[in-house]
Amino acid sequence: MSVSIKPLEDRIVVRPLEAEQTTASGLLIPDSAQEKPQEGEVVAVGPGRFEDGNRVPVDVAVGDVVIYSKYGGTEVKTGGTEYLVLSARDVLAIVVK
């Protein structure tokens, strides 16, 4: 997937995954009651930040599915798709399947 957003330093661009639309028992969850997704696919990664004159690479790669901080990042919309620009520090874990 080609994204027209190029993150700087240790920032990443994530496409949030869809929130669950139904409960485990099959009840439909209305939009007003759905929580913000905290899981998404990494679609772009910055080159990393400088620390003591050396570039520190980002720990995630394009295609990784990550869990991120609930209130981290900045929402942006481009090409009709919503993305989240996060600092690598806002990523809590990589989902391994």
From Swiss-Prot:
Establish whether keyword Chaperone is in the entry: yes
Q: Which UniProt keywords apply?
A: Chaperone, Cytoplasm
Domain of life according to the entry: Bacteria
Q: Name one GO cellular component term.
A: cytoplasm
**What is any Pfam family matched here?**
Cpn10
Task: Describe the protein's quaternary organization and the partners it interacts with.
Answer: Heptamer of 7 subunits arranged in a ring. Interacts with the chaperonin GroEL.
Give the protein name, as stated in the record.
Answer: Co-chaperonin GroES
PROSITE patterns listed in its UniProt record: CHAPERONINS_CPN10 (PS00681)
Please indicate if the UniProt record lists Transmembrane helix as a keyword. Answer: no
Q: Name one GO biological process term.
A: chaperone cofactor-dependent protein refolding
Read off the InterPro entries from this record: Chaperonin_GroES (IPR020818), Chaperonin_GroES_sf (IPR037124), Chaprnonin_Cpn10_CS (IPR018369), GroES-like_sf (IPR011032)
Q: Which GO terms describe its molecular function?
A: ATP binding; metal ion binding; protein folding chaperone; protein-folding chaperone binding; unfolded protein binding
Q: Where is this chain primarily localised? A: cytoplasm
Family from the record: Belongs to the GroES chaperonin family.
- State the function annotated in the UniProt record: Together with the chaperonin GroEL, plays an essential role in assisting protein folding. The GroEL-GroES system forms a nano-cage that allows encapsulation of the non-native substrate proteins and provides a physical environment optimized to promote and accelerate protein folding. GroES binds to the apical surface of the GroEL ring, thereby capping the opening of the GroEL channel.
Its annotated compartments are:
Cytoplasm
Q: Which CDD domains would you find in this protein's record? A: cpn10
